[in-house]
């Protein structure tokens, strides 16, 4: 399974692509989309949209994983980050990719083992897990960590969803004497 991970941001959007076969991970590509701050908001969102479309076209992922926006102390920053995230979601939808979303806590826990890990710890574990020669840049490392999180957690969630659906299908409501039972 090829996973495209995205760490959305209005100034810098990180992306990382890995191949996952069971627990084996292989690095494919990563980078940071740097958006010129002089552009208007719509132009900045278009830069993110166009670049992520291109990344998806070139790397041909099977699935995408995206970090969920956290609530910042500054509501305006949170709204702007949400718009960058929206541009990323549009690019992924346009590329017909299934999108899975994870919180920063879930990503850090899946990659480092603790949800309170520092950025440097995430970078170091990404480097180790993917056998990289150097430490990836922070935005790329976060995106690769998101992809790694999905590679480790996503298949389990898929199985649980299928089991939940099967359990729901197997438990049809029953009627006895015109009343609902069980």
Swiss-Prot record:
EC number: 3.1.21.10
GO cellular component, one term: Holliday junction resolvase complex
Pfam families the UniProt entry points to: RuvC (PF02075)
Signal peptide: none
Cofactors demanded by this protein: Mg(2+)
Keywords: Cytoplasm, DNA damage, DNA recombination, DNA repair, DNA-binding, Endonuclease, Hydrolase, Magnesium, Metal-binding, Nuclease
Catalytic activity: Endonucleolytic cleavage at a junction such as a reciprocal single-stranded crossover between two homologous DNA duplexes (Holliday junction)
Main location: cytoplasm
Top class in the EC scheme: hydrolase
Binding sites annotated in the UniProt record for Mg(2+) 1: 7, 139
Hydrolase as UniProt keyword: yes
Co-factor: note: Binds 2 Mg(2+) ion per subunit.
Coiled coil: none
Top-rank taxon, per record: Bacteria
GO MF annotations, alphabetized: crossover junction DNA endonuclease activity; DNA binding; magnesium ion binding
Subcellular location: Cytoplasm
Active site: 7, 67, 139
UniProt: Mg(2+) 2 binding residues: 67
Subunit composition and interactions: Homodimer which binds Holliday junction (HJ) DNA. The HJ becomes 2-fold symmetrical on binding to RuvC with unstacked arms; it has a different conformation from HJ DNA in complex with RuvA. In the full resolvosome a probable DNA-RuvA(4)-RuvB(12)-RuvC(2) complex forms which resolves the HJ.
Family to which this protein belongs: Belongs to the RuvC family.
HAMAP family linked: RuvC
Function in brief: The RuvA-RuvB-RuvC complex processes Holliday junction (HJ) DNA during genetic recombination and DNA repair. Endonuclease that resolves HJ intermediates. Cleaves cruciform DNA by making single-stranded nicks across the HJ at symmetrical positions within the homologous arms, yielding a 5'-phosphate and a 3'-hydroxyl group; requires a central core of homology in the junction. The consensus cleavage sequence is 5'-(A/T)TT(C/G)-3'. Cleavage occurs on the 3'-side of the TT dinucleotide at the point of strand exchange.
Protein name from the UniProt record: Crossover junction endodeoxyribonuclease RuvC
Organism: Bordetella parapertussis (strain 12822 / ATCC BAA-587 / NCTC 13253)
Designated gene of the protein: ruvC
